[in-house]
Amino acid sequence: MSPYIWYPNPIIPDIAKAVGPERMKRWTPVKEAIDSGTLVVAGSDWNVVPSVNPWIAIETLVTRHVRGGGGEALAESEKITLQQAFDLFTVNAARQMGTRNRTGSIERGRLQI
């Protein structure tokens, strides 16, 4: 799931016009996917984002607010825990790539990339 559209940002009003208010209540249903047992990882094919900083993505997954807080939350029911947010970028990504036996966590003998 793309971390660049799961919190309020300039493109969201245009998306809301296209999909409507009911669908926006479930916008980017990260929590729903995790709760259903889906292996969720962060990623994007959108190369025009101002920053690929994972800490911004982790913060906004947990708060569903713009970076630094404040304003209205986007699909507040889709907030996840800090541990779940870390997992998207670490162990879940390693599982998705089939490298969980050697990456995805900070442990002796693991590759850190």
Regions found by a protein language model. Name each.
Residues S2-I113:
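His/Asp/Glu-enriched, well-ordered alpha-helical/loop segment
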